[in-house]
């Protein structure tokens, strides 16, 4: 199966789609007016210290102060001696920072909703093969590099470039890479860090010291270890910029770059636009006839699996098992496609067979292993729910593309026509007792107004008799179903 990246560029927006086997697996979107700031380094100033929350707010020049927890401040632990095994405890925030103090911080989570960005003082600088860790003295290796001999080789090579400036983490893409390429990467990261430290010496505060790469370059860097067959770009300027970027940092990717000039929009090649639309819906259909219901809330994401129309096996246990197995693949894809993070609760269809539960869990873990974002599956809880987490750094596709519904205000439901009709009648009675008027005029949405004139007309007539006044109903086309006004005449 082929894998490729499609880069779609307009003056205000860049979108990158990752296609594997002809199917959209990931979509990355960046808008000029709302560029993500994860990875950016700032010189900020502590604006508030909150001992009760073990946190501080830091002004880094954004609209909202950013959040810094004590556990994200380095050095953030101290050893408690006198026990058989060492324990590490987070030091009190008041001992670590003070109001008005200048700090160099890095953004680890974009602002989301009412929350400001989340920060750390544990700075890291990523490149193609390495991650530079200022102040560290060790070399770490990605767990995805399984060969022990290769891990040792890489550690030995990279250890030579560790000094007082910092240490390194060796990324998965470094597997099999020669010493020259690793040395070049290490030197590049140290040059970047030197520039950051020079900028930090400036007397002013609340400004950016380092900016993460633009979306297209960042995705190419992060996909450097992926087996891509081609990278198609529909913008000449972006294509040339990526040629320059890959020629310097990822030369083997250069030959895969193509400037797409076809008449058909680039995303139409793989039905990407429709896939994006489907990724905004709650319901995800499974090929078997079953389906998922995905609900994203501020606290967590929940996924519910249902058999739906799937009755393909005589044995109910087998039907449930096969639906759950199919669901694991769909869930893993949807988490990547929608960029869902944080706590995720999965409600598989109940299984009494312990072997079936074990195999479903294994299938989920295998499907998630393809995810480039860190995931952790905790297994089935006592209530039969699977609890897992997925690292959240950037906004989900829903938060990028959608606003809160102005009708239901994020509830996901609106009051029924019947409910609104009865609210209007109660309001008429309330106003009648409070004020003097000759008659009432009700403005309501088309559906509610029609109901008041139709099936609820008898109830409205009883209200007229009770208040002793005429009630006239008028349609207001611009009102949503819950809106109405009762006007005294």
UniProtKB/Swiss-Prot annotation:
It comes from the Bacteria. Keywords: Cell cycle, Cell division, Cell inner membrane, Cell membrane, Cytoplasm, Cytoskeleton, Endonuclease, Hydrolase, Magnesium, Membrane, Metal-binding, Nuclease, RNA-binding, rRNA processing, rRNA-binding, tRNA processing, tRNA-binding. An endonuclease that acts in the processing of the 5'-end of precursors of 16S rRNA, generates a precursor with 3 extra nucleotides at its 5'-end (which is matured by Rnm). It prefers 5'-monophosphorylated over 5'-OH or 5'-triphosphorylated substrates and cleaves single-stranded sites rich in A and U residues; contributes to RNA turnover. 5'-monophosphate-assisted cleavage requires at least 2 and preferably 3 or more unpaired 5'-terminal nucleotides for cleavage. The optimal spacing between the 5' end and the scissile phosphate appears to be 6 nucleotides. Confers adaptive resistance to aminoglycoside antibiotics through modulation of 16S rRNA processing. Disruption phenotype: Slow processing of the 17S rRNA precursor to 16S rRNA, with significant accumulation of a 16.3S rRNA precursor with 66 extra nucleotides at its 5' end. Ribosomes with the precursor 16S rRNA show decreased translational fidelity and an increased sensitivity to aminoglycoside antibiotics neomycin and paromomycin. In contrast another group, using independently generated rng deletions in 2 different strains, showed decreased sensitivity to aminoglycoside antibiotics kanamycin, neomycin, paromomycin and streptomycin. A double rne-rng mutated strain no longer processes the 17S rRNA precursor. InterPro entries: NA-bd_OB-fold, RNA-bd_AU-1/RNase_E/G, RNase_E/G, RNase_E_G_thioredoxin-like, S1_domain. Induction: Its mRNA is degraded by RNase III (rnc); in the presence of aminoglycoside antibiotics levels of rng mRNA decrease, leading to longer precursor 16S rRNA in the ribosome, which prevents antibiotic-binding and thus increases resistance to aminoglycosides. Residues 244-489 are annotated as: Required for function, when replaced by GVHSRDDKQAGALHRTPADFRSL in mutant BUMMER, cells accumulate 16.3S rRNA precursor. Its main location: cytoplasm. It is a peripheral membrane protein. The presence of a 5'-monophosphate on substrate RNA accelerates its cleavage by catalytically activating the enzyme. In contrast, another group has shown that the enzyme has a higher affinity for 5'-monophosphorylated substrate, which enhances substrate binding in vitro and the decay of RNA in vivo. GO terms for cellular component: cytoplasm; cytoskeleton; plasma membrane. The keyword Metal-binding applies. It is found in: Cytoplasm; Cell inner membrane; Cytoplasm, Cytoskeleton. Binds 1 Mg(2+) ion per subunit. Its cofactor is Mg(2+). The keyword Hydrolase applies. This is Ribonuclease G. It comes from Escherichia coli (strain K12). Homodimer, in equilibrium with possible higher multimers. One of its GO terms (biological process) is cell division. GO terms for molecular function: endonuclease activity; metal ion binding; protein homodimerization activity; ribonuclease G activity; RNA nuclease activity; rRNA binding; tRNA binding. Belongs to the RNase E/G family. RNase G subfamily. Pfam families: RNase_E_G, RNase_E_G_Thio, S1. Changing residue 304 to N: Loss of activity. Accumulates about 50% 16.3S rRNA, 50% wild-type 16SrRNA in vivo. Residues 39-128 form the S1 motif domain.
